[in-house]
A protein has these predicted regions:
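Tubulin/FtsZ superfamily GTPase core signature
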Residues: 1-99
Length: 99
């Protein structure tokens, strides 16, 4: 299993998920092994309970999942929204790749 955690670090609630997607597009990728060998990818997008995912963010969340899934097309992609105390207006992305 290869974990990766990204934080939005935007300090602007309206940009938290777009910033995660931009970060993934620029820097995130499968580099340690051939992505074809993965059988499952788990994606969790977390926000503070006081700043939950809003309706306008759903499309960006879907793009994040699509981007991650596209790196390993044969893998099953499971995803969910979660909560994490202390994130404030930021979002956290947890990605677990497994064989």
């Amino acid at each position: 299993i290869t974990p990766a955690t990204y934080h939005s670090r935007t300090y602007d609630r309206s940009r938290r998920l777009p910033n995660l997607l931009e970060t993934l597009t620029r820097y995130g990728g499968v580099t340690e092994v051939d992505p074809i060998t993965y059988t499952r990818v788990v994606v969790i997008i977390s926000t503070d309970p006081e700043a939950p995912i809003e309706a306008h963010e759903i499309g960006c969340a879907a793009e994040i999942v699509k981007h991650i899934g596209g790196q390993s097309p044969a893998a099953e992609v499971l995803w969910a929204f979660g909560t994490e105390e202390g994130l404030g207006d930021e979002a956290e992305l947890l990605v677990e790749w497994s064989y």
